[in-house]
Every structure is written in C-alpha cells, then in structure tokens.
Amino acid sequence: MAITRLLLRLIATATVTAGVAVVSTAPATQAQPPNFPDLKAFTDAPANLHFSRPVRWASGYAFFRTPDGVNCMMGSVTRCTGSLPGLPPGEYGACATVLQTYEEETRSLPFRFEASSEDCGPTTDDPLGVGQKLTFTTNYATTCVVGEGRLTACIQNEHGFVLQPSGSWVF
C-alpha cells in the first residue's frame, strides 16, 4: 500500500514537472516594433481553411494569398511575392518579393526586398482575409496579418515586414 502511494506521488510529480517543461518551452511573445500592427486586433484564420500544399517539399510551410493578390509562404523561408504596395515599381518591377531565409548564416538578418523581372503567376492558395491572422510554428514562430487598405504584415522573432501603400518597410 505504501509503495503504491509512493508510486502515485512520483507519477504525479513527474506529470506536473513535464507540464511545467512544456509551458516553459512555449515561444515567447514577439516584440513588435513601433508602427507594427497590433496582433491582438486580428482574429485567427478559420480552422477549416488549409494553408498547406500536397507536394512533399511544402510540408514545412504554410501558404496564403491576400485579397489584393500577394502570395505568401511561411516556414524556414518566409516571403511574400506580388505587386507589393508602397514600393517604387520602377525599382522592384511588377512582381517584387519581401523575404528572409532562415539559413544558419542569415538568422540575425532582417527581411529584405528583391526585384523581379518576371510577372507574378496566379495562385490557388487559401485567402487570409482582412482582419485575420495566421500563426505558423513548425520551423520558426511566424505570425502574418492582413488588414484594411492593402496592409500585410509578418513578424518572425525580432524581424519582419509591413506592406502598405503609404510605404512598405522591413526590420
């Protein structure tokens, strides 16, 4: 009887300890820079949407499109491609990209804009609607939001970007 109680007490202690370990490994709240949209003002994307693709290489990513036709991918490479608002079209072309690659040597670098000489292709990815956010934590915790007035913003750890007609920026 005493052994049974001792075993039950050990199991209970191990369960509580395991629970604390899980909680302590949860991602910390991402620090948002000034003028970054308030993530709490957006609602989670509907659970019935599938922000994935069936091809094998895409299993570690989430994909979505915005109402204004920007195509985004979240994962070890996070990027959005399209007619990005707030960028000079003569400098970046009709299909610009904002991205960050999460390779070992670039982990501490901010996102960047890249020009493209090609037109953007169509996408069938599920839409992320105005007022919605999508958080993807498979590789690196990334949250993207879509707001009114062609606003798209993503944050991944201490880096991210804001796309908006009044001026897009990266950090």
Predicted feature locations:
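Extracellularly exposed regions in secreted/surface proteins, prominently low-complexity, repeat-rich
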Residues: 140-171
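Secretory targeting and sorting signals
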Residues: 1-31
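A cross-kingdom feature marking solvent-exposed beta-strand/loop segments within repeated
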Residues: 48-59, 64, 135-138
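Acidic, glycine-rich flexible loop segments
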Residues: 115-152
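Short, surface-exposed binding/anchoring microloops in extracellular/periplasmic proteins
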Residues: 59-86
